[in-house]
């Protein structure tokens, strides 16, 4: 299969022997053949990178549709963020890699890597801007009206402030390690898609050192959205962001110093896997060697809250080897994906889609012996409209059949509860 981002038959250029796991594998360039149909003009092709973003426009449109139940709108918003994360990790990383290598030739669709990058960043910025406007102006107010609130620091009651303080010292303080940014401390390793805080300081630390800034990394074990217990919640479903708790108590991490600013940021890194296919004898071992490095690939995007000072944003860009075009300022949590947990914590069927009940193919509806049914002919199973139960039954019957010597499956993108 030839994509517009791969060398097109009939075009000149070397063909890589290095394949990307999860991406198009480019084979040897076809030999010259005078009988081959000449290449089609660019207008006959769609650019894969740009089309992926246009797909996310359609997903975002579902979140923007006011006929969609509020908690489902939140889910669609989270899906867009999750898709964009993967898009930057793989697709944008690939384009930036081409630019780094000096690739300038246009693809079959007539677009060169620099033009592709320019267009995709424009569309991505438009999507992100629409996301946060939608979150702040429609979805959060709609949820608040229904009794699902995300409380800001200024809205906390004295009882809630005390609960938050106890939560900070009990759950957060033991796992937070501030890292000073000075000549004695190199810029810390910031893992892919992790939540971090850039803290601006005044004064001297406990060792008498004059420190102007520090980084605080939030471990993944800490929940990004915390539900208030009923004893202190002011409503049926009150939540607080982890970022709000840290902002309220970040000074506890810097004794004797004055915190003048605390800003969340998040780095997206190149997460593609590279394997020299022709030289690898054991693919499993090769992947085991590559996987640990995915969290520390080249940075491709920096997300910061919109209150971060230009000086701090420029400093982070410089440390990460990024340009201003890679910076995305947002008015809200830098990782909307973590809001996906909220609908599961709220028992409000009136704010969700009615659960869908998948059916069974006619051939399996009354079947008592799956193997016997399959001997009569193939059965098409159309997920998610039809139940996954026949697959489980198939495995179960195979496991019990003495004539079955092995069961092998390809597992891809399983659910969290699989």
Residue ranges of predicted features:
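N-terminal localization/anchoring segments of enzymes in phospholipid and broader phosphate metabolism
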Residues: 17-418
């Amino acid at each position: 299969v030839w994509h517009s981002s791969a060398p097109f038959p009939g075009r000149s250029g070397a063909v890589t022997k290095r394949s990307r796991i999860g991406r198009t594998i480019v084979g040897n360039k076809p030999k010259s053949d005078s009988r081959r149909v000449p290449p089609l003009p660019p207008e006959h092709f769609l650019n894969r990178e740009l089309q992926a973003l246009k797909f996310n426009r359609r997903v975002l449109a579902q979140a923007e549709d006011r006929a969609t139940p509020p908690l489902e709108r939140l889910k669609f918003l989270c899906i867009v963020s999750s898709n964009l994360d993967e898009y930057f990790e793989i697709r944008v990383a690939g384009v930036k890699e081409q630019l780094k290598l000096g690739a300038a030739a246009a693809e079959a669709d007539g677009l060169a890597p620099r033009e592709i990058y320019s267009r995709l960043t424009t569309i991505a910025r438009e999507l992100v801007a629409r996301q946060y406007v939608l979150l702040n102006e429609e979805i959060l107010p709609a949820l608040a009206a229904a009794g699902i609130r995300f409380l800001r620091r200024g809205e906390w009651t004295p009882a809630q402030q005390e609960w938050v303080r106890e939560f900070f010292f009990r759950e957060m303080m033991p796992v937070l390690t501030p890292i000073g940014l000075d000549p004695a401390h190199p810029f810390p390793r910031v893992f892919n898609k992790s939540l971090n805080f850039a803290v601006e300081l005044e004064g001297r630390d406990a060792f008498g050192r004059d420190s102007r800034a520090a980084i605080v990394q939030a471990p993944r074990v800490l929940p990004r959205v915390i539900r208030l217990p009923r004893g202190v919640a002011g409503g049926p479903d009150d939540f607080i962001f982890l970022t709000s708790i840290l902002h309220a108590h970040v000074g506890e991490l810097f004794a004797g110093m004055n915190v003048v600013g605390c800003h969340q940021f998040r780095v997206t890194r190149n997460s593609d896997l590279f394997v020299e296919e022709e030289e690898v004898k054991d693919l499993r071992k090769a992947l085991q060697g590559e996987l640990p490095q995915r969290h520390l690939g080249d940075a491709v995007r920096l997300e910061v809250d919109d209150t971060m000072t230009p000086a701090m944003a420029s400093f982070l860009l410089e440390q990460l080897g990024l340009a201003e075009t890679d910076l995305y300022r947002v008015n809200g949590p830098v990782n909307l994906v973590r809001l996906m947990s909220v609908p599961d914590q709220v028992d409000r069927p009136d704010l969700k889609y009615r659960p869908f009940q998948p059916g069974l193919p006619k051939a399996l509806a009354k079947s008592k012996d799956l193997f016997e049914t399959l001997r009569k002919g193939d059965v098409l199973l159309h997920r998610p409209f039809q139940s996954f139960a026949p697959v489980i039954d198939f495995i179960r019957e195979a496991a019990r059949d003495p004539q079955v010597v092995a069961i092998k499956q390809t597992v891809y993108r399983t659910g969290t509860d699989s």
